[in-house]
Amino acid sequence: METNLQQVKNSSQTFSEKQNPKQEASPSPISSTCSSPSHDFSFTISLQPLSSSSKHISPTLRSPSKTTSSYQQTDPFAVDLSPADEIFFHGHLLPLHLLSHLPVSPRTSTGSYNDGFTLPVKDILPDQPTNNNNNTENAITNISTEAKDDNTEDKAEGEIRVKTKPIKSFSLFGLSKWRKGFESNEREQEQQQQKIKKPMSLDLSHAVKKYIRMLFQKRGNGTQFWNRRQTSSYSFSSSLMGPNGNSKTMINGSYNKRDLIRGRRGELFSAPASMRTSPTNSGHLRVSTAGLSSSSGSTSSSSSDSTMEELQAAIQAAIAHCKNSSAVDRDDKVKDS
């Protein structure tokens, strides 16, 4: 069993060296796997009859000394062991029955990511030549330049899109949006005008209210003056001479009812000339201004009623006094004659 395992390893090495002579400059994954310790590999051998996958692999394993031409004339379904990355991954053998259906592609470079499984940069041995370092650096620089080119292309496309915006076609939806915007602008303007008009209207209303108050105050003062004039108290002083020579005076326009009735009949109201010429007893009416200087407390209803009655009585007494004085003058003229 051990001899069979060694034969498998030797055949894979010789086959890879013959088919890929260009990979000698750069360390291949197979060399790295071969240089790795043997405990990384695990093989399972079964004593069952050969399967389809083992049948395909058997010609390569039984005749390791054959040339590359003989390997090329083998069954097309056989697995090509030349690219070791397709068989070994991180030092472990992959199942061959899955790889038998995959198309085999010749490997041109070890740094490409599209050719199946590859070893990472960490697994490369330190004994590699300077050419490999140069190749990796060139690949990194190429990737960075490609990324920069992609960024510049994206920026240029974005600028072109911004510059060449498609002109919107005329549609009813556009009209509706335009109308809505126009109406909103009109509403804003109206609101601003209303805000400006409100303080003006408030000022006008305030001024009108002030003017009306002033008018009412003036009118109130006038009404108070007329009320005072109407409710002012009057004092009258007059003297009446009875038939017996008794004088009866009227103060504040008050006479007895009997005296007034007698005066109407002509029984009263006889006085000498000396008394007639005196200002106190001449019968002249004198209005006292006490009522004009009185306070507003005299404007009650009871005082107004009493003053009206006094005025009426005073007027009647004045009329009677005039009649009596004229009758007395006539009598004097008759006596003198």
From Swiss-Prot:
Q: Please, what other remarks does the record include?
A: BRI1 is not required for BKI1 association with the plasma membrane, but the BRI1 kinase activity is necessary for the membrane release.
Q: Which stretches does UniProt call biased (Low complexity)? A: 26-38, 288-310
- One Gene Ontology MF term: protein heterodimerization activity
Domain remarks in the Swiss-Prot or TrEMBL record: The c-terminal part (253-337) is necessary and sufficient for the interaction with BRI1.
Places the protein is found:
Cell membrane; Cytoplasm
Q: Out of the domains of life, which is the source?
A: Eukaryota
Cite the record's tissue specificity text. Answer: Expressed in leaves, petioles, shoot apices, hypocotyls, roots and flowers.
Name the species this protein comes from.
Arabidopsis thaliana
The residue ranges flagged as biased composition, category Polar residues, are 1-25
Q: What is this protein called?
A: BRI1 kinase inhibitor 1
Q: What is its main location?
A: membrane
Listed under GO biological process in this entry are:
brassinosteroid mediated signaling pathway; lipid metabolic process; negative regulation of brassinosteroid biosynthetic process
Q: Which GO terms describe its cellular component?
A: cytosol; plasma membrane
Q: How does it assemble?
A: Interacts (via C-terminus) with BRI1 (via kinase domain).
Per the entry, what this protein does is: Negative regulator of brassinosteroid signaling. When associated to the membrane, limits the interaction of BRI1 with BAK1 by binding to the kinase-inactive form of BRI1.
Modified how: Phosphorylated on Tyr-211 in response to brassinosteroid perception, leading to its inactivation: once phosphorylated, displaced into the cytosol where it is inactive.
